[in-house]
Amino acid sequence: FPFDLLPRMIDAGDWVEIVAGLVQRVRALELFLSDIYGPRDAVADGVIPNTLVMTCGGYLRPVVGIEPPGGRRIYLAGVDLVRDDSGQWRVLEDNLRNPSGLSYVLQNRAFMRRLMPEAFASHLVANVDHAALLLRDALTAMVPDEDAGCIALLSPGPWNAAYAEHAYLAQQMGAELVEGRDLVTRHRRVWMQTTGGMRPVSV
């Protein structure tokens, strides 16, 4: 994975502003997805052409009208930022379908801490070690209390370029790493096939 020996340092004031902007942006994207898969007011009001929605390769027609648990569709967003000539932060792109890179952040930070402990001692570097646990907590928050299923991280398999990340995140979250062939649906529920029998999957 990519490793930058001299990572970009962002001061706390800038970071607070970036976080506020990213939270606002992801909330707006969440509202947009809820509308596009629900009442479609943005299309009806002419904000976005219906043709653009219907011909988009990422538009999943089978989930139109389905309200996800807790009403949330976005649990992890990959937002690429750049700083322009004037020093302002700009969004280069959003990735909501299959964002990657979280494990790289965690592994890079752990490596940097071992490589340059004095830099971490002399600066108040924000801790990111809990990021995978925050993701796990966000996923489990949508599961009803009575549900005894597990969390499964679905991966295309070892041949996929992001497989190492999938394995690392699953391990960090305490989730099961599965491929499509490991899963079946029965009685309107997803089950994971294991050597010990079928195990329900909650998320």
State each model region's role.
Residues 1-203:
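Preference for protein termini
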